Every structure is written in C-alpha cells, then in structure tokens.
Amino acid sequence: MNYFEFFSLPRHLNLDVLALEKQFYVLSRKLHPDRFAGKSAAEQEAAVAQSSLLNDAYRTLKDPIARTQYLLTLEGVQLEEQSKSATDAARATGGQKKQIVPPELLEEVFELNMQLAEMRANKQMGEDEPELRRELLTAKDAFDEKMLQTQLDLDTLWSQWDAAIDSGDEPAKLAARDAMVALLNKRSYLRNLVRDVNEALE
C-alpha cells in the first residue's frame, strides 16, 4: 500500500493539507498503542507498523516537494541525487559527487565556479576582495530568483498532472511527469549553488 492509498487519496499533487492533517489525527487516535494494550502481540505489532506507516505517509504528503518526489518514484522515476547529504558523503570518501548541470545554467555555473575558486583562494591567503564578494552576492540573488520561478513552474505542473490523472490523458500525464523531473533536478542543483555561495561567503 502506497502513501496515497493509505489516506484513500488519488495520486494528486494539489492536496488539501488541512483535510490531510485532520485525517492524520483521526487515524493516529485509531492506531494509538493504548487501544491495543489488551490485544495479542501480533495485533500490537501490526498497530505499531501501521502507526509508523501513517507517520511516514503524513510527513511525505504534507510537504509538496516530498510529495512530488514520492509520486514520481511511484511512477518509476529515478531522480538525480543532488542533495547536500549526497554531495557531502562523496566528499568525505574522497570522491566527487557528479551533478548534472541544467543546460540553461551552464554559462552561469561556469562563471560562478571561477568566482568560487577565486574566493576560496583568497580566504586561504587571508585576503578579502569586496568586489568579488559583491559579485557572488549578486549571483546568489539571481539563483534565488530562479528558485522562485522553479516553484511557480512546479505549481503549474501540479495542476496539469492532476488534470491529466482525472481525465485519463496519458500523453499529458507523461509530459507533466518529465517536466517535473527536470524542474526538481534544476531546483536541487540551484539549492546546491546557493549553499556553495553561502559557504564561500562565510
């Protein structure tokens, strides 16, 4: 049983979060361990497992990005791992975390990497270059703006996905799915860029 089925929901991305929360509390009371105190060990274990599933499902579905990522995995999509934890883990083992640069960001990323390398070199020598710092802050602001636009684009795609699910329009569903994958990967990459700039400016 997947998380949507657990809450008796269609695979929609625009959910009524308040209704979801209300249902969560109803199910939480129903599955509370105290209600199974006099039951068999098997029933108690089943209740604990259901309660754990409930918590995981609610935590995932109440967050729109986590909800989208989860739905895409249900659709058989493997998202690019570009999280901070994955990147840090690669660094800790001496490896290099491979990140796929969104094509539209190639030029900006190339320039940013040069600026970051210069900033790190300056810090190692105990120097500070105000102009370079201003350039990095400007770049960070630009990436923050792109993050906001990415969120707006995702909002549109969520509605397109839901409409395709309701109408059974498979081509529209696949188009929305592929576009969401690209946007989530772009969002993840942008977050890492902003983090790198913040670390360089510390």
What do these predicted regions represent?
Residues 1-202:
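C-terminal accessory/regulatory regions appended to core domains
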